[in-house]
Amino acid sequence: EDVATDKLFEKCYDGSALGRPILGTEETLAPITTETMHKYMHEYYRPEDTVIAVSGHFTDDDLDYIADLFSVMTGSGRNQITPAIYKPSLVLRSKKIEQNHLCLSFPGVSALSKDRFTMNLLCNILGGGMSSRLFQSIREQNGLCYSIYTFTTPHQDTGLMSIYTGLGEETERRALERILQELHQFCEDGPAKDEISRTREQAKTTLLMGLENTGTRMM
């Protein structure tokens, strides 16, 4: 599953930082030393680029103390970010395992877009849980996969909406055809009113439950 997702980003954002595996590769990690890490930190870590979030019992003095600790950073460099441009592509990776992993991705919206909330609702309607369209159609009604879900990956200037499914070799073609049928039907008919209402309530519940966790509130 992780390999499929890594390959997905590698091809969709080929040539940009978003297309690189987050853990790096053997070739990129081998030359790194303690000295190069310290040099990078001193050059690029700047107070004005640092966000400190806390949750819990902190006094103003505590926050001032934390801010002072980070104020000594003296970096002045600026990374040049190559714009991530979505590129349609097909990538295959062969591996001798019982289960096949399939990812389909489409251009989404950025983390700053006003449409990001609509995108989240769309994602949940299609594959956000056991009552979603894809889960019911592909897994429950037709038994064509082991798991299926949708997810979004919004970034500063771009985003993806993706469908993941784990399935067997004997059902992958039928599952893909059925997924495409569900997408075409959604584009033609749109969501039902009860789907929108249910998904809105799910989003509200998830938000409220998340606020009970101090770590989630901090993030």
List where the protein language model places each region:
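His/Glu-based metal-binding/catalytic segments typifying zinc-dependent metallopeptidases
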Residues: 78-133
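Charge-rich, well-structured scaffold segments of protease-associated domains
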Residues: 1-77, 110, 140-219
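M16/MPP (pitrilysin/insulinase) zinc-metallopeptidase core fold and M16-derived inactive scaffolds
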Residues: 128-144
